C-alpha cells in the first residue's frame, strides 16, 4: 500500500493507493496551521479504516511538509515533481497544468521542454486571496462563484495581493458597485495574475489541466482562465489530490505507522523562532500605561441632555464611524462598526434609530468624510463634505492645541500630518498598499479565529513577540505560518504583528531622520491605535510618550462634526440632512453601466435615491453628468495629446506603411519619428492612444509582472499593429535621449532604452520572416552617426533608401521635434498666464512623457482640473531653471533626461507660491525611487508640500482624489471640501 500526504499552505490532503494505483481512501481538509494535530487525526482515521495496516510506503509533499519530514525522518517529494508524475500517469498528452492552492500557484509546462513556474513569497492571486476578498464582500468563499455567475460587468482589480485589491474593491463598494460584478472581477484578476506573473510570456495552449481547490470548486474561475487564454481547460476527477497521489506514486520507503504519532508529538513540542522583547514586562507596567492614556479625553454626554447637535460621519474604507456632538464639544452619541460592503444601509439604520430615540435633539448640520463621502453626501443630503486629512486635523487640534504631529492609522489608510504654527505643514499618506493598517491585523485575527479586539488583548500577554519585520500581508502570511510551525503562540504572533505595523508606518511611510524630527506633541488616532499593543509598540520604537484620545477610532467623524459646526456658525441655515419621514421613504438602487461618450468606456455605477436623485461614480470626467465634453483649455496634458493627434500624415506613401507602438518615449519622440519616416516615403500608423483593450491584447507575452505598467502596455501596442496586418514596425532601442544641456548626461531609463529587445524576445510573431521589426540601437546626439545607423538599419528591408534621403529626413525630424517642443512650452506659458489672471492654483503634474497617456494616468489630469486648478507638465516649466546651478544643489547625479526635468520642475515650483507639484510615479519604477526623494527634498526644504500619486493598471481614483484634495486643503487654496 502507498500513502501520499500533501501538506499545503492552508489544507492537507491524503491519498491511499493500492499496489495497482487505485485510490482506496482520500481526504481534503483545512489545517489552520495545526499541522501535527491534523496529521495525528488523519492517522487515527486511517487506522480505524484499515485496522490491520501497520506499515506502508509513505511520502510527504507540499509547502508545509518539509518541517514534518525533517523532524520525523520521512521521505519528501517536491510538489512540482509529484504533480508532474501524477498528471503524466493519469492524463497522458497534457500540455500544461495550472494549479492554484491556498497560498501557492504554479504552472507546469509538460512535454519535451518541461518547465515549472511557481509564485514566490507573494500569495496574490491564490486561494488565500479569494478568501480575503470574500471576507471583504461579507460573503462565504463558496458564494463567490454564485455571485460571479450573475455578473454583468467586470472592473480592473489588482490581484498582486489582498491589500492592494482591497484598495481597489473598497472604493467600488463604497460607490455602490454590485457584489456580483466584483466577484467576477476578482476571478478575472486571479486569472490575469497567474498568466502574467507565472507564465511570464510563455504561451499556454493545447490540453490544459486545472488543479487545486479554487479551480476545482469555482467554475467561474475556470471560465475566467478559459476566457483570458482562449482555451477550454479540463478539471479532472480527484483534481484536489494530484500532489498527494503523485507523492504516493513516488513513495520508496516503508514506514512503521505505529510509531508515527510519537514522532509527530515530539516534533510539535519544539520551539525555534526569532523573537523580540515583550511589550510589557509585567501587569504593573501595563496598569501605568493605561492610566497615562486615560487622561486625554473628549467629554462624554448623552443626546438626552442636549436640544441641538452636530453630526459627523466618517465613511471609511472598511468601517462606518458616526459622532454626534453638542455645541460645546461633548460627544453625545457614537457609532462604529464594519460597513460590511454597504455603507448606505449602516448610515440609514443609524439615523433612523437616532431620530426615533431622541426626537427632541435637533441636528443643526452634518458633514461627511472618508472613502464613501460622495455616496453618503448625495444619498442622505449631508450638508458638507470634508477631505479626511483635514477632518482628523481639526479633531486632533481641538484636543491638543499644540499638536505638531498626527499619525492616523485606519482600516486601509495611514495619514501622517506635520503641523507648524497651527496649520498643516506636510502630509504623508501610505501608497496603494495598506499593509501597515487595521485591515492587516484584522485579516490575521480572522484567519486565526479571533475578533480584532480579542486578538489585541491576547497580544498584551506575549512573552516572546515574533520578529516579523515590516512586510506586506501576504508576504507575511508565510512568516506567520512558519512561526506557528515553530511553536509560536497566538499571543506572540499578535504582538509581533502589532510591532510590524508600527515598523511599516515608521520606516515605509514616515521615514523620520530622527525621533526629534517627528515632534513633541504627537497625537495618534484611528481605530488601529485602540489596540494597546500597537500603541505600546509605537512608543517603544520611537522612545516617546504620545497622546491617544479616548475616541481614537472616531476622530475622523468627530472632526467632521467640528467642521459642520464651524461652517454652520459662519452661515446658519436649515439642514439638508434627511429627516425621519424622508428616511422612511428612502430608496436606494444600484445599476452598473458602461459610458459610451468617449473611448475610455468607463464602468459607471449609478446610484438612484428617492425622488430620482442620482449619484454616478466610476466616471473620470464630468461628461456622464453634464453631457458636455470636458473643457481642456487649462490642461496641458490634453493639449499635448491633441498636438500628437494632429501630426501630418503622408497620404501618398511610396514605401507603404510603417507602424509605431504608441507608448513610453514615443509620447515625446513621435513628432521626430513621424517627420523622419514620412520624409522617407512611409505612411506612419501608430497604435491607438485611448483604447482600453490594448493591455489585454499583449497580456500573455509579458515576461515579468514587476515591470512598470507603461512597459507592459507596449506588448499590446505591438500586438495591435500586427493584428492590422502591418509588416513594418519601427521601435528603436535608445540608450540616450536628446541632450537638453546642463545635465551630467542624457540617459534614458533602462526600460525605455531597451524594451524593444524584450518585445522581440517575447512576441513570437515579430520573428516571422514577413515582419520587419526595426529595433536597432539609435542615438540622437550626433546627426552624422544617426544618418549612418539609419542607413544600415533600413538597408535590410529598403536598400533603395539613399544616404541623402536620410540626411534630409533627419533634418526634417529635428525641425519637427523642436517645433513641437516650442509649442508645448508656449501652450504651457499660456495656461500659466491665464490661471494667474483668473487666480486659479497651478498644478505641475510631473512625470515622464508617457504619463500623458490616458491609459496610464487614468485621467488624473481631468480630476485635478475639475477641482478648479490649471495643469501643466514638467517640461513646460523645467527650462526656466538653469540646470548647472541646480546641479550644485542636488544630492544625486543628474544624468537622466527625464529626471533632470523633474528636479528643475520641483525647483521652479518651490520658487513660485501659486504652483504645486504632484508627481506621478508608476509602480515598479526603480528610477523614481530616487527622483521622488529628491523632488520631496527640493520642495520641503523651502516649506512646500510634496505630493506623490502611484499609478498602475488600476483605474479607481479614490485614493488619488484624497491626496489631491489634501494638498489643496493644506495649502488653503480654496474651499475644496465643499466642491
Q: Predicted regions span which residues?
A:
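Gly/Thr-rich phosphate-binding beta-strand-loop-beta motif of the actin/hexokinase/Hsp70
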Residues: 1-20, 94-111, 300-332, 403-420, ...
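Short glycine-rich, Thr/Ser-proximal phosphate-binding strand/loop in the N-terminal lobe
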Residues: 4-44, 115-116, 120, 313-345, ...
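Glycine-rich phosphate-binding loop plus the immediately following alpha-helix
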Residues: 34-35, 112-153, 240-243, 249-253, ...
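Glycine-rich phosphate-binding loops at beta-strand->alpha-helix junctions
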Residues: 64, 199-228, 239-243, 369-372, ...
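Conserved phosphate-binding/catalytic loops in two-lobed NTP-binding clefts
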Residues: 76-80, 226-245, 383-390, 539-558, ...
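An N-terminal assembly and electron-transfer interface module characteristic of large anaerobic redox
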Residues: 119, 123-130, 433-441, 448, ...
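Glycine-rich phosphate-binding/hydrolytic loop that grips phosphoryl groups
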Residues: 127-132, 237-271, 394, 438-443, ...
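Phosphate/ATP-binding catalytic cores across multiple sugar-kinase/actin-like superfamilies
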Residues: 182-206, 247, 290-299, 496-519, ...
Amino acid at each position: 500500500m502507498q500513502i501520499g500526504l500533501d501538506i499545503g499552505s492552508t489544507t492537507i490532503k491524503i491519498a491511499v493507493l493500492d499496489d495497482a494505483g487505485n485510490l482506496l481512501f482520500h481526504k481534503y481538509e483545512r489545517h489552520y496551521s495545526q499541522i501535527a494535530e491534523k496529521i495525528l487525526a488523519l492517522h487515527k482515521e486511517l487506522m480505524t479504516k484499515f485496522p490491520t495496516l501497520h506499515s506502508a510506503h509513505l511520502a510527504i509533499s507540499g509547502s508545509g511538509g518539509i518541517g514534518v519530514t525533517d523532524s520525523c525522518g520521512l521521505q519528501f517529494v517536491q510538489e512540482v515533481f509529484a504533480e508532474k508524475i501524477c498528471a503524466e500517469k493519469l492524463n497522458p498528452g497534457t500540455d500544461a497544468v495550472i494549479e492554484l492552492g491556498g497560498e501557492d500557484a504554479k504552472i507546469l509546462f509538460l512535454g519535451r521542454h518541461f518547465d515549472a513556474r511557481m509564485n514566490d513569497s507573494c500569495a496574490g492571486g491564490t486561494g488565500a486571496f479569494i478568501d480575503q476578498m470574500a471576507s471583504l464582500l461579507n460573503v462565504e468563499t463558496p458564494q463567490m462563484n454564485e455571485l460571479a455567475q450573475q455578473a454583468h460587468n467586470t472592473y480592473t482589480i489588482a490581484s498582486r495581493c489582498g491589500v492592494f485589491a482591497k484598495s481597489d474593491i473598497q472604493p467600488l463598494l463604497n460607490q455602490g458597485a454590485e457584489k456580483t460584478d466584483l466577484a467576477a472581477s476578482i476571478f478575472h484578476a486571479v486569472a490575469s495574475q497567474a498568466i502574467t506573473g507565472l507564465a511570464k510570456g510563455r504561451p499556454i495552449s493545447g490540453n490544459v489541466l486545472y488543479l487545486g481547490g479554487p479551480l476545482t470548486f469555482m467554475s467561474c474561475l475556470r471560465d475566467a482562465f478559459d476566457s483570458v487564454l482562449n482555451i477550454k481547460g479540463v478539471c479532472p476527477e480527484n483534481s484536489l489530490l494530484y500532489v498527494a497521489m503523485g507523492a504516493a506514486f513516488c513513495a520508496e520507503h516503508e514506514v512503521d505507522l505505529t510509531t508515527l504519532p510519537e514522532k509527530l508529538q515530539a516534533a510539535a513540542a519544539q520551539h525555534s523562532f526569532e523573537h523580540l522583547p515583550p511589550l510589557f514586562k509585567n501587569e504593573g507596567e501595563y496598569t501605568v500605561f493605561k492610566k497615562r492614556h486615560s487622561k486625554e479625553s473628549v467629554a462624554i454626554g448623552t443626546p438626552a441632555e442636549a436640544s441641538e447637535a452636530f453630526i459627523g460621519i466618517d465613511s471609511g474604507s472598511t468601517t462606518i464611524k458616526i459622532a454626534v456632538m453638542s455645541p460645546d464639544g461633548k460627544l453625545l452619541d457614537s457609532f462604529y462598526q464594519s460597513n460590511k460592503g454597504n455603507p448606505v444601509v449602516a448610515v440609514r439604520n443609524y439615523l433612523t434609530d437616532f431620530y426615533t430615540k431622541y426626537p427632541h435633539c435637533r441636528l443643526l448640520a452634518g458633514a461627511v468624510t472618508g472613502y464613501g463621502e460622495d455616496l453618503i453626501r448625495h444619498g442622505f443630503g449631508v450638508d458638507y463634505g470634508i477631505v479626511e486629512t483635514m477632518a482628523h486635523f481639526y479633531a486632533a487640534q481641538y484636543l491638543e492645541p499644540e499638536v505638531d504631529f498626527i499619525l492616523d492609522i485606519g482600516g486601509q489608510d495611514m495619514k501622517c500630518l506635520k503641523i507648524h504654527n497651527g496649520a498643516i505643514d506636510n502630509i504623508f499618506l501610505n501608497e496603494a498598499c495598506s499593509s501597515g493598517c487595521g485591515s492587516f491585523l484584522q485579516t490575521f485575527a480572522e484567519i486565526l479565529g479571533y475578533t480584532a479586539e480579542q486578538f489585541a488583548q491576547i497580544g498584551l500577554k506575549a512573552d516572546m513577540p515574533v520578529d516579523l519585520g515590516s512586510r506586506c500581508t501576504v508576504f507575511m502570511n508565510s512568516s506567520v505560518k512558519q512561526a506557528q510551525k515553530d511553536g509560536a503562540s497566538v499571543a506572540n504572533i499578535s504582538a509581533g504583528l502589532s510591532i510590524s505595523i508600527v515598523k511599516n508606518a515608521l520606516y515605509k511611510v514616515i521615514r523620520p531622520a530622527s525621533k526629534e524630527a517627528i515632534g513633541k506633541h504627537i497625537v495618534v488616532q484611528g481605530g488601529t491605535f485602540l489596540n494597546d499593543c500597537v500603541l505600546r509598540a509605537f512608543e517603544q520604537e520611537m522612545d516617546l510618550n504620545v497622546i491617544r484620545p479616548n475616541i481614537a477610532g472616531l476622530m475622523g467623524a468627530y472632526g467632521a462634526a467640528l467642521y459642520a459646526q464651524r461652517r454652520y456658525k459662519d452661515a446658519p441655515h436649515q439642514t439638508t440632512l434627511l429627516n425621519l419621514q424622508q428616511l422612511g421613504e428612502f430608496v436606494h438602487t444600484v445599476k452598473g453601466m458602461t459610458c459610451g461618450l468617449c473611448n475610455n468606456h468607463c464602468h459607471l455605477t449609478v446610484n438612484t435615491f428617492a425622488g430620482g436623485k442620482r449619484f454616478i461614480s466610476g466616471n473620470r470626467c464630468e461628461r456622464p453628468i453634464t453631457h458636455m465634453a470636458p473643457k481642456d483649455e487649462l490642461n496641458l496634458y490634453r493639449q499635448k495629446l491633441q498636438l500628437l493627434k494632429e501630426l501630418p500624415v503622408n497620404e501618398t506613401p511610396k514605401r507603404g506603411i510603417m507602424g509605431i507602438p504608441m507608448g513610453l518615449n514615443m509620447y515625446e519622440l513621435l513628432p521626430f519619428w513621424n517627420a523622419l519616416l514620412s520624409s522617407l516615403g512611409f505612411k506612419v500608423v501608430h497604435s491607438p492612444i485611448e483604447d482600453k483593450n490594448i493591455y489585454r491584447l499583449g497580456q500573455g507575452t509579458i515576461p515579468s509582472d514587476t515591470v512598470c505598467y507603461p512597459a507592459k502596455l507596449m506588448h499590446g501596442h505591438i500586438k495591435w499593429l500586427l493584428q492590422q496586418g502591418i509588416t513594418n514596425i519601427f521601435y528603436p532601442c535608445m540608450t540616450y535621449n536628446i541632450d537638453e544641456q546642463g545635465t551630467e548626461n542624457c540617459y534614458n531609463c533602462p526600460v525605455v532604452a531597451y524594451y524593444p529587445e524584450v518585445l522581440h524576445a517575447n512576441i513570437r510573431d515579430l520573428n516571422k520572416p514577413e515582419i520587419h521589426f526595426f529595433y536597432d540601437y539609435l542615438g540622437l546626439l550626433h546627426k552624422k552617426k544617426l544618418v549612418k545607423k539609419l542607413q544600415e538599419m533600413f538597408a535590410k528591408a529598403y536598400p533603395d533608401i539613399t544616404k541623402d534621403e536620410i540626411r534630409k529626413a533627419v533634418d526634417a525630424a529635428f525641425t519637427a521635434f523642436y517645433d513641437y517642443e516650442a509649442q508645448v512650452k508656449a501652450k504651457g506659458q499660456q495656461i500659466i498666464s491665464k490661471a494667474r489672471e483668473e487666480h486659479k492654483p497651478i498644478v505641475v503634474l510631473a512625470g515622464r512623457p508617457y504619463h500623458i497617456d490616458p491609459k496610464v494616468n487614468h485621467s488624473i489630469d481631468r480630476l485635478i482640473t475639475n477641482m478648479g486648478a490649471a495643469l501643466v507638465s514638467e517640461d513646460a516649466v523645467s527650462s526656466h531653471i538653469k540646470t548647472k546651478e541646480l546641479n550644485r544643489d542636488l544630492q544625486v547625479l543628474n544624468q537622466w533626461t527625464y529626471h533632470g526635468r523633474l528636479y528643475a520642475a520641483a525647483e521652479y515650483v518651490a520658487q513660485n507660491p501659486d504652483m504645486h507639484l504632484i508627481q506621478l510615479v508608476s509602480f515598479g519604477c526603480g528610477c523614481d525611487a530616487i527622483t521622488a526623494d529628491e523632488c520631496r527634498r527640493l520642495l520641503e526644504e523651502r516649506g512646500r508640500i510634496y505630493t506623490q500619486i502611484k499609478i498602475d493598471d488600476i483605474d479607481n481614483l479614490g485614493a488619488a482624489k484624497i491626496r489631491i484634495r489634501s494638498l489643496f486643503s493644506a495649502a488653503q487654496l480654496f474651499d475644496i471640501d465643499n466642491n
